[in-house]
Amino acid sequence: METQKLVSMVKEALDKYSYPLTAKNIKAVIQKEYKVVLPTGSINSILYSNTELFEKVDKTNTIYPPLWMRKTN
């Protein structure tokens, strides 16, 4: 999968959910919604290389409600 497409998927996932997402949540959302399998570390490498996206990601260990409760349409 090309990097630019993955970056746009990450942006879309961050915009779609109102609560903060961790890198693990973003990977789960993308794999479920796009029915793709992502290599280990692919989301982290995208986030670390893009400061705009990295700032939006939750870096705490806070427990949030399940993703299905957070979906905003």
Curated annotation (Swiss-Prot):
Keywords annotated in UniProt: Early protein, Virion
GO cellular component terms, semicolon-separated: virion component
Intracellular or extracellular location(s): Virion
Entry's induction text: Expressed in the early phase of the viral replicative cycle.
Homology family: Belongs to the asfivirus I73R family.
Protein name: Uncharacterized protein I73R
Species, as recorded: African swine fever virus (isolate Pig/Kenya/KEN-50/1950) (ASFV)
